Amino acid sequence: MAPCRTMMVLLCFVLFLAASSSCVAAARIGATMEMKKNIKRLTFKNSHIFGYLPKGVPIPPSAPSKRHNSFVNSLPH
């Protein structure tokens, strides 16, 4: 029973070393990766939030429209 347990522990240790060494090698920065030296600051020009808005078109006001929201005698007297 003891030799079988020793072989299982040794096999698990070898598998652990193989798995951890492959993960470390993948995370290491090599010559194939390009590092950016100039990091842009988050401003209004290059912000992702303002990139979704249309360019050159004014944003309509958020007030209710007087054309389709006006009912005659809608106020209680």
From Swiss-Prot:
Q: How does it assemble?
A: Interaction with RLK5.
Q: Name one GO biological process term.
A: response to ethylene
Q: Name one GO cellular component term.
A: apoplast
Q: Which organism is it from?
A: Arabidopsis thaliana (Mouse-ear cress)
Localization, UniProt: Secreted, Extracellular space
Which molecular-function annotations from GO does this UniProt entry contain?
Answer: signaling receptor binding
**Record's comment describing the protein's domains:** An extended PIP motif (50-69) is sufficient for abscission induction.
What residue spans carry the region label RLK5-binding? 56-69
For this UniProt record, give its keywords in alphabetical order, as a comma-separated list.
Secreted, Signal
Mutant phenotype after disruption: Floral organs remain attached to the plant body after the shedding of mature seeds despite a normal floral abscission zone development, including abnormal petal breakstrength (pBS). Delayed cell-wall loosening during shedding associated with less pronounced and delayed abscission zone (AZ) cells rounding.
**Lineage of origin:** Eukaryota, Viridiplantae, Streptophyta, Embryophyta, Tracheophyta
Q: Which gene encodes it?
A: IDA
Q: What induces it?
A: By wounding.
- What biological function has been recorded for the protein in this entry? Involved in an ethylene-independent separation step of floral abscission. Promotes abscission zone (AZ) cells rounding. May act with RLK5 and HSL2 as ligand-receptor pairs.
Tissues where the protein occurs = Expressed specifically in the floral abscission zone.
Q: What else is known?
A: IDL1 is capable of replacing the activity of IDA while IDL2, IDL3, IDL4 and IDL5 are only partially redundant.
* Residues making up the signal peptide according to the UniProt record: 1-26
Concerning InterPro entries, the annotation shows: IDA-like
Extract the PANTHER family matched here. PROTEIN IDA (PTHR33599:SF20), PROTEIN IDA-LIKE 5 (PTHR33599)
Q: What is the effect of changing residue 66 to A?
A: Reduced binding affinity for RLK5
| Name of the protein described by the UniProt record | Protein IDA
